[in-house]
Amino acid sequence: MNDFPWLTIIVVFPISAGSLMLFLPHRGNKINKWYTICICILELLITTYAFCYNFKMDDPLIQMSEDYKWINFFDFDWRLGIDGLSIGTILLTGFITTLATLAAFPVTRDSRLFHFLMLAMYSGQIGSFSSRDLLLFFIMWELELIPVYLLLSMWGGKKRLYSATKFILYTAGSSIFLLIGVLGISLYGSNEPTLNLELLANQSYPVTLEILFYIGFVIALTVKSPIIPLHTWLPDTHGEAHYSTCMLLAGILLKMGAYGLVRINMELLPHAHSLFSPWLMAVGTIQIIYAASTSPGQRNLKKRIAYSSVSHMGFIIIGIGSITDPGLNGAILQIISHGFIGAALFFLAGTSYDRMRLVYLDEMGGMAISIPKIFTMFTILSMASLALPGMSGFVAELIVFFGIITSQKYFVISKILIIFVMAIGIILTPIYLLSMSRQMFYGYKLSNVKNLSFFDSGPRELFLSISILLPIIGIGIYPDFVLSLASDKVESILSNYFYG
């Protein structure tokens, strides 16, 4: 057990500091904004410092563990810890939340509440990634939903209430399955109920019961991933949410579902996962094609980007279903990669909306002349999204391909079919991304309108865009920086399938 409660501080600090902001005298929106940014930067620095000095990359076991008694009757403790699977997502959360707070500068209405909700969401997300107790994971999972609902319903577009209601119905409804699974798995096979993830990882179940647990967790976790047909809340939510909220949704929220699939379904229920992995592969493959085919038909700019997120999440599902070292490593790398790329695209879509107040692509055109900096950044990040070599998306998708090829679980004809369908999806990706850029920036539609002028990116927006672009290029050039964090943990998880 760790001597100093680093993880408790990292989890509790954002929401505690945010609560303090609600009681401070109202001194104007700028004070609230800079206070929140300072909290996020300080949190990120504390997290980075704690991990640099306490995390050992060659140790697949839980590190920096903390265990404080809470409710003895349920064996419910405040258990926190990190490993190679969670460290990358925690750092991603800190980085994206800090930039999303900076992106939220134009928000002026109820600024204190808005920034408090962002900090509360920050705590919930880090708590989910660092929980070593199944019920604590569920509580953090739910804690993070409330700020998203309020951010969407209070600072969204014209249909924000519809989108917020749809979001909460999907996510809260699926959480019922998560709660049933948590209670069922903790009560089974032991005289005393246990919620400790490390103990549950060594627990065996009857095949039928393990399958039932697996299905319950899959329904709960894949709503957030999201997997078709449970994805329909996502385009509506992205279409109406403020773009700083979209950055948090695309960059972090979707990754929580994928993280849960690895942490719970793969690690706790290996036999059921082995049975259901072909279905995950099939759904992931269909998802890539379906979302890539649906995206070009979306008039709303943010909805088109949302469908591209659904398509890219298909690669993560395939990597998880492959049950191979390259496949799972590729899925983890894609979680980090798409966290940056998705957040960046939504930020640029939002800054474009701030200037022209248009959301439909068929009303845009000719913006490249007026806003060349935004045009350049949007083009570069679109290239990153379509997996251009040298960018993080290319490496992640390539490693997932290797995972399918090297899988011993599937017949050659099945692997060829999966790769062929994935290749079609990869071909469709530049079609909808490049057509989106063409509709926004080329032509003469807006450039011919008299007395219409746009301001290009200011220092804040340019700094934010470059800050997201640098890790995308960095991971694309040197992916081992991320892969080395999780490689030992991946081997430890997969040992349950080949040696367990």
Swiss-Prot record:
Catalytic activity field: a plastoquinone + NADH + (n+1) H(+)(in) = a plastoquinol + NAD(+) + n H(+)(out); a plastoquinone + NADPH + (n+1) H(+)(in) = a plastoquinol + NADP(+) + n H(+)(out)
Membrane topology reported for the UniProt record: Multi-pass membrane protein
Transmembrane parts of this sequence: 4-24, 35-55, 87-107, 113-130, 134-154, 167-187, 211-231, 242-262, 272-292, 305-325, 330-350, 386-406, 416-436, 462-482
Superkingdom of the source species: Eukaryota
Keywords, sorted A to Z: Chloroplast, Membrane, NAD, NADP, Plastid, Plastoquinone, Quinone, Thylakoid, Translocase, Transmembrane, Transmembrane helix
GO cellular component: chloroplast thylakoid membrane
Primary location: plastid
Pfam families: Proton_antipo_M
Listed InterPro entries: NADH_Q_OxRdtase_chain4 (IPR022997), NADH_Q_OxRdtase_chainM/4 (IPR010227), NADH_UbQ_OxRdtase (IPR003918), ND/Mrp_TM (IPR001750)
Molecular function via GO: NADH dehydrogenase (ubiquinone) activity; ubiquinone binding
Compartment(s): Plastid, Chloroplast thylakoid membrane
Any single biological process term in GO: electron transport coupled proton transport
Documented EC number(s): 7.1.1.-
Family of the protein in this entry: Belongs to the complex I subunit 4 family.
PANTHER family: NAD(P)H-QUINONE OXIDOREDUCTASE CHAIN 4, CHLOROPLASTIC, NADH-UBIQUINONE OXIDOREDUCTASE CHAIN 4
NCBIfam families per UniProt: NDH_I_M
Name recorded for this polypeptide: NAD(P)H-quinone oxidoreductase chain 4, chloroplastic
Lineage: Eukaryota, Viridiplantae, Streptophyta, Embryophyta, Tracheophyta
Name of the coding gene: ndhD
